[in-house]
């Protein structure tokens, strides 16, 4: 068993299909923006919907702070498309149907079988700067991630973050 990704590690690169069916590679999203990568159990569940809508409601704050939000679950790209449309989600959802990326990050399963809910803040260089792991504290995922993104914005203005 792998130890999973830790703060300070390079984020494992991957390519997965988005809700539009287009392949998305993590490495291609880094460089200009911080990536907030959140893993959640499933679309259209109470927790999955609450978390996605919380990220949606704070989406402008994330983009203003120089971050891109990306959600990952085992749902298909088609299911993600319906979920994103239904809840007006402005960010990318990725289909990790085999759980390969979840395993690469070491996202734990709740109760041993429910896919976990973990958020990673990855800086422009691809380094994991923060991990928040909680199945029940949905607001914590959004609030902590935004706080870290804003801190990175002030710490790393030379990397192209807007300041002020």
Feature map (PLM): residue ranges:
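Chalcogenol-based redox active-site neighborhoods
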Residues: 1-164
């Amino acid at each position: 068993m792998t130890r999973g990704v830790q703060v300070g590690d390079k984020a494992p690169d991957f390519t997965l299909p988005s809700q539009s069916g287009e392949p998305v590679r993590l490495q291609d999203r880094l460089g200009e923006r911080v990536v907030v990568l959140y893993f959640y159990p499933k679309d259209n569940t109470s927790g999955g919907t609450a978390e996605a809508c919380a990220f949606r409601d704070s989406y402008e704050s994330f983009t203003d702070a120089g971050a891109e939000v990306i959600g990952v679950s085992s749902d298909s790209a088609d299911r993600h498309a319906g979920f994103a449309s239904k809840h007006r989600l402005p960010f990318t959802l990725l289909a990790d149907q085999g759980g390969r990326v979840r395993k690469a990050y070491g996202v734990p399963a709740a109760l041993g079988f429910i896919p976990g809910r973990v958020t990673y803040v990855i800086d422009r260089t691809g380094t994991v700067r923060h991990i928040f792991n909680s199945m029940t504290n949905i607001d914590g995922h959004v609030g902590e991630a935004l706080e870290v993104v804003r801190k990175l914005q002030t710490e790393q203005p030379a990397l192209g973050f807007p300041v002020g």
